[in-house]
């Protein structure tokens, strides 16, 4: 299964990514094992820790997850320009809400209605 995830650092920085293994990926971001993104690794070197805010599951392919990830980041940037007072977390969550209200994430993506199971958001409590 493929996932698109939203993580937040202890200082409030945010990151959106895609993976097939959530447990391994968060360990990579926190530099417990090799393979984290440069953007998150630098924060860890400064003592920050990353944790999941939420993730979206049920993508039929990894490619569909990547399309969703790209669009989530794009909507987040648009929201930041429209309302710079939003916190990074607010911006990401609002973008996710808007993205899930669409029929599909991008013009070349599958319709959500064609997924075997519709995208589902799982929040970390």
What are these regions (language model features)?
Residues 7-9, 33, 116-119:
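Generic alpha-helical secondary structure signal
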Residues 6, 16, 56, 60, ...:
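Compositionally biased, intrinsically disordered low-complexity regions enriched in proline and serine
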Residues 1-3, 48:
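Residues that flank catalytic or metal-binding motifs in active/ligand-binding sites
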Residues 3-9, 13-20, 25, 29, ...:
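GIY-YIG nuclease signature motif recognition
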Residues 66-67, 73-125:
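Boundary/linker segments flanking structured domains
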Residues 22-64, 71-90:
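Conserved short loop/helix modules at catalytic or binding sites
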Residues 2, 12, 26, 56, ...:
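Generic intrinsically disordered, low-complexity segments enriched for polar/acidic and small residues
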């Amino acid at each position: 299964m493929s996932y698109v995830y939203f993580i937040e650092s202890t200082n409030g920085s945010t990151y959106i990514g895609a993976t097939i293994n959530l447990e391994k990926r968060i360990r990579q971001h926190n530099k417990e094992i090799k393979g984290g993104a440069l953007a998150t690794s630098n924060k860890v070197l400064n003592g920050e820790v990353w944790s999941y805010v939420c993730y979206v599951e049920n993508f039929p392919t990894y490619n569909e997850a990547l399309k969703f990830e790209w669009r989530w980041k794009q909507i987040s940037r648009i929201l930041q320009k429209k309302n710079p007072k939003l916190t990074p977390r607010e911006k990401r969550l609002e973008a996710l809400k808007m993205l899930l209200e669409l029929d599909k994430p991008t013009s070349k993506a599958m319709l959500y209605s064609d997924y075997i199971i519709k995208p589902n958001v799982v929040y970390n409590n």
